[in-house]
């Protein structure tokens, strides 16, 4: 009996401890009260896939109750997690982002095509052919030169960006090595034939279409079978209202835009359809009531043929929420993977959304708000279209579609390789060794090389123009009046800081930084207040943490054998600053040393340090575990009686144990156990591996092995999915998520988990920051923003000479870009013929001039509030991206003024002339006549109706406009000739919960200018 009671109490205690640990990780505390920023800092690593629905077995039955079909689908209905603090009546929204947007992912079209670049062919160690494309470009407002490389293989494309150095040459071998390709069966040879651009563009287009077709199925109240739904000849008034919200009604006869598989000649697929353009994507909707209806055919095969072959289908169902609801198992289709169920509530004029995704479809955003009810119809349209586009892209990553794409890529690459091999010994392939540096044009063959490059550019620009005219160009955001605040927008914190910053951390609204030559300084959040020196240069701090709830500053100072950890009371430092005492020196810090940490080269603290602060110091190949237990109340009382206590908190720390490793760790992270009772772990990275070390026993477990010749460890970030620990392991340009819970006693179960995933950064990061739902990579000259749950790219911004300074709370980074840089500097002005190979006869990119002797370049500090990234991802109301419906042909007419919201034109007079030339060129190609801008909407359909005669004349005109192409393509590139800016003085709607900022950085949203605009 007693044993049963003890066993029961033991289970209850374990359950209570797990719940307690979970609440602690969510920012709750039983002993102290953390600041708001501290709570956010603890929440940044908390995430849940439950926001994206849960997998359910859905069964449909007929009227007699017999089971017809069953299937496993992930259901998203905006439900609230039972342990969340949701308040009824509050809306929980997330930011709406297109994932993996084509204007960031279609590199070859954007950066290579129509520019002088180099292409190589070779075979790897497994005798699989591959192609490599390399270009040197500075297509950004900061004129930051970057090497961009694309590796084409049967498994897909791998993209990487490498920093440019005028003093260091870059070889093809080093580029391939950065892509983890070190062994070859045949070394790469350069391809000189300009026609290779067409084949490589075809390879890139295998990533998926830039245009989409979606099914729209109308279901009356009570209809539970697909035959009943497809047999609805007409829709209701509310359904017609919904269709008008989605897009515009177009006449299919003679339609020359994206047709989505519909007949545009003989009306065999209906007379009208719904069409729109959203952020550069052409969308065609297969509407069930607009497709041909047959009274004799009850199954409506013609309708099912189109809608059943759509990957994504919208189901508009009449009736209230209490009536029987649609289930995906009601539809007999092996091709449709995603269903969006839409219901309209006439009482409050709102739409309710529910998403069903086949189980194999990867997670995609944006997650549904809670509740998933939209009263703003434009807001609903934006959310729905982005959700559908992201859903179709995610479906293409399922095994079924991925295997088909891999077979197609393999066939295309092998076919292209076989076509090139007969010319291996001819002039088509350059015999230069793959270990040679990217070559310069030989002076003896300057004229020949100039002619070859001119032909290469001409072919590429003509190909780009044809792609644009055809409507297949990845020109996202061209047709939008997009001008909105993004959560990652930065604020100016300090301009023209004269010292190099080694490390830093936020202290309230201020920033504490350690410099290389001026000691430690406190920077206030005010341009009028000068920096305050806290420590002089005798104390060289290499790493620091400011823990306000603990009233503690931890710093690692000095190097080599003299390195140690120092601990200070923040209250003592603050008092010294306020009383304007003398600046502290290294000698003044003798009482603040943790002596046993002598020789420490790295340390790490636990993220959730509300109750117990744990520090692990690495001293060569030895780990020293240190703890400090003291509540905030005790700390406050000790401060109040500071006359009777010491200024140094050294005595409050205790050394727990030492753990020996087989090598010195390069990266460390502390992982909280599920109960907090002797089950904490330490993640260490060394050699070619990440290991987990049990804090209590010192036992090591292999977490991840890095299969690469060279390893550059970046970070190990502890994250907690629904309370269970996981790790984001970052090395080279790879990020891997590993789940390390649940624990079995003291042993973590580190078997492969279905929730594990990995993705590649486009550039090797120097630091990474996790702020759910985002993970940010800080590279040498860019910030790359992805989603934590799936690794999908959201945005890339170019920031020159970038360095992350602090990220424990708000994110601070430094850059050489001045605050008042010209924000209207168009990237297309300086991106003409940029290439690794010096293009004789063409203008080279304007690279920043090196500093002279004795010159020092000032740094500028910027801040991204963590509340914008973490807090607003759950609590911020969704704002419409202000994207208007567009009914237009993909080949745009630029005679009418583009609608701009508080924006300014960034084109000079010469740029406007180039724009006119490009516009006339396209009109000549299409055979269009000049139309007044006021009639643009009315004649947009007519613009797409090209006669056979015009189509024949188009081919003749193409040969006559090569000169106009070369002049105009720089403005045609991406079909964006006007950079729409959001100046700080413009009257743009700002979210209420966003702090007022000068907003020196703006992440531009035009096709070419995907950078931080400096204002």
Swiss-Prot record:
Keyword annotations from UniProtKB, A to Z: GTPase activation
Biased segments, Basic and acidic residues type: 949-959
Pfam families per record: CNH (PF00780), Rap-GAP_dimer (PF21022), Rap_GAP (PF02145)
Record field: compositional bias (Low complexity): 823-835
Record carries keyword Protein transport: no
Record-linked SUPFAM superfamilies: Rap/Ran-GAP
Domain CNH: 498-812
Annotated segments matching region Disordered: 821-842, 924-1004
Molecular function per GO: GTPase activator activity
PANTHER family cross-referenced by the UniProt entry: GTPASE-ACTIVATING RAP_RAN-GAP DOMAIN-LIKE PROTEIN 3, RAP GTPASE-ACTIVATING PROTEIN
Family: Belongs to the GARNL3 family.
Domain called Rap-GAP: residue spans: 200-416
Any one GO biological process: regulation of small GTPase mediated signal transduction
Stated name of the protein: GTPase-activating Rap/Ran-GAP domain-like protein 3
């Amino acid at each position: 009996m007693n044993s049963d009671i003890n066993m029961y109490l033991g289970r209850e205690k374990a359950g209570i401890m797990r719940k307690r640990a979970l609440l602690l990780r969510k920012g709750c505390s039983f002993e102290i009260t953390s600041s708001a920023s501290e709570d956010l800092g603890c929440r940044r690593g908390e995430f849940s896939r439950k926001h994206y629905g849960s997998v359910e077995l859905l069964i449909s039955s007929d009227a007699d109750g017999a089971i017809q079909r069953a299937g496993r689908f992930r259901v998203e209905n905006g439900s609230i997690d039972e342990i969340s603090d949701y308040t009824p009546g509050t809306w929980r929204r997330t930011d709406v982002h297109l994932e993996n947007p084509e204007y960031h992912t279609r590199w070859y079209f954007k950066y290579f095509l129509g520019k002088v670049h180099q292409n190589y062919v070779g075979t790897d160690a497994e005798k699989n052919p591959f192609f490599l494309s390399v270009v040197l470009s500075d297509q950004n407002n900061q004129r930051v030169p970057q090497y961009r490389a694309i590796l084409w293989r049967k498994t897909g494309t791998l993209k990487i960006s490498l920093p440019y150095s005028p003093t260091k040459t870059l070889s093809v071998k080093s580029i391939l090595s950065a892509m983890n390709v070190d062994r070859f069966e045949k070394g790469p040879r350069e391809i000189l034939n300009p026609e290779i651009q067409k084949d490589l563009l075809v390879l890139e287009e295998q990533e998926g279409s830039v245009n989409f077709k979606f099914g729209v199925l109308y279901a009356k109240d009570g209809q539970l079978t697909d035959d009943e739904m497809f047999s609805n000849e007409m829709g209701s008034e509310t359904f017609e209202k919904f269709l008008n919200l989605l897009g515009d009604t177009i006449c299919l006869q003679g339609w020359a835009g994206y047709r989505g598989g519909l007949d545009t000649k003989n009306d065999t697929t209906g007379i009208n359809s719904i069409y729109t353009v959203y952020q550069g994507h052409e969308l065609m909707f297969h509407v069930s009531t607009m497709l041909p209806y047959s009274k004799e055919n009850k199954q409506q095969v013609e309708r099912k043929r189109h809608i059943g072959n759509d990957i994504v289908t919208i189901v508009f169902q009449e009736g209230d929420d209490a009536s029987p609801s649609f289930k995906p198992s009601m539809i007999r289709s092996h091709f449709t993977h995603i269903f969006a169920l839409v219901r309209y509530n006439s009482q409050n004029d709102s739409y309710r959304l529910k998403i069903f995704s086949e189980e194999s479809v990867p997670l995609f955003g944006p997650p549904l708000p809670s509740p998933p009810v939209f009263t703003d119809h434009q807001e609903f349209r934006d959310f729905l279209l982005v959700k559908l586009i992201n859903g179709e892209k995610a479906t293409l990553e399922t095994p079924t579609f991925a295997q088909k794409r891999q077979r197609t890529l393999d066939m295309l690459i092998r076919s292209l390789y076989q076509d090139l091999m007969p010319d291996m010994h001819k002039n088509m392939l350059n015999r230069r060794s793959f270990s040679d540096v990217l070559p310069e044009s030989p002076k003896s063959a300057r004229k020949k090389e100039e002619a070859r490059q001119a032909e290469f550019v001409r072919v590429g620009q003509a190909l780009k123009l044809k792609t644009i005219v055809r409507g297949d160009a990845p020109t996202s955001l061209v047709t939008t009046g997009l001008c909105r605040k993004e959560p990652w927008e930065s604020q100016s914190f300090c301009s023209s800081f004269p010292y190099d910053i080694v490390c830093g951390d936020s202290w309230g609204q201020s920033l504490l930084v350690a410099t290389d030559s001026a000691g430690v300084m406190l920077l206030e959040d005010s341009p009028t207040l000068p920096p305050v020196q806290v420590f002089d240069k005798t104390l060289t701090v290499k790493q620091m943490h400011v823990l306000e709830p603990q009233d503690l500053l931890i710093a690692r100072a000095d190097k080599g054998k003299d390195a140690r950890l120092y601990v200070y009371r923040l209250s003592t430092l603050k008092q010294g600053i306020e009383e304007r005492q003398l600046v502290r020196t290294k000698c003044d810090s003798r009482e603040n040393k943790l002596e046993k940490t002598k020789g420490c080269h790295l340390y790490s603290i636990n993220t959730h340090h509300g109750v117990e602060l744990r520090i692990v110091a690495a001293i060569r190949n030895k780990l020293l575990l240190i703890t400090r237990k003291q509540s905030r109340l005790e700390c406050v009382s000790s401060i109040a009686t500071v006359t009777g206590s010491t200024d140094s908190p050294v005595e409050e720390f205790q050394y727990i144990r030492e753990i020996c490793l087989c090598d010195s760790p390069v990266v460390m992270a502390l992982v909280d156990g599920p109960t907090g009772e002797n089950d904490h772990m330490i993640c260490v990275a060394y050699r070619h591996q990440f290991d987990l070390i049990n804090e209590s026993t010192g036992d090591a477990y292999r977490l991840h092995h890095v299969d690469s010749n060279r390893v550059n460890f970046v970070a190990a970030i502890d994250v907690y999915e629904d309370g269970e620990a996981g790790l984001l392991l970052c090395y080279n340009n790879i990020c891997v998520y590993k789940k390390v819970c649940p624990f079995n006693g003291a042993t973590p179960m580190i078997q492969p988990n279905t929730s594990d995933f990995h993705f590649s950064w486009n550039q090797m990061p120097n630091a990474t920051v996790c702020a759910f739902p985002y993970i940010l990579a800080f590279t040498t000259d860019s910030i790359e923003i992805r989603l934590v749950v799936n690794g999908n790219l959201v945005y890339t911004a170019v920031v020159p000479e970038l360095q992350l300074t602090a990220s424990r709370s708000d994110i601070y980074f430094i850059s050489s870009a001045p605050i008042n840089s010209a924000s209207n500097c168009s990237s297309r002005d300086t991106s003409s013929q940029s290439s690794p190979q010096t293009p004789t006869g063409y203008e080279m990119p304007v690279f920043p001039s090196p500093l002279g002797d004795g010159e020092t370049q000032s740094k500028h500090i910027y801040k991204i509030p963590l509340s914008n990234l973490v807090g607003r991802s759950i609590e911020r109301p969704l704002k419409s991206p202000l994207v208007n419906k567009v009914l237009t042909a993909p080949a745009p007419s630029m005679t009418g003024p583009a609608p701009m919201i508080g924006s300014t034109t960034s084109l000079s007079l010469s740029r406007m002339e180039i724009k006119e030339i490009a516009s006339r060129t396209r009109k000549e190609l299409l055979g269009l006549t000049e139309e007044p801008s006021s009639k643009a909407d009315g004649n947009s359909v007519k613009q797409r109706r090209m006669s056979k005669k015009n189509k024949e004349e188009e081919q003749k005109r193409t040969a006559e406009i090569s000169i106009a192409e070369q002049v105009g393509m720089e403005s045609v590139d991406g079909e964006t000739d006007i950079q729409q800016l959001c100046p700080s003085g413009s009257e743009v709607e700002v979210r209420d919960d966003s702090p007022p900022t000068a907003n020196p950085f703006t992440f531009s949203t035009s096709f070419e200018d995907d950078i931080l605009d400096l204002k």
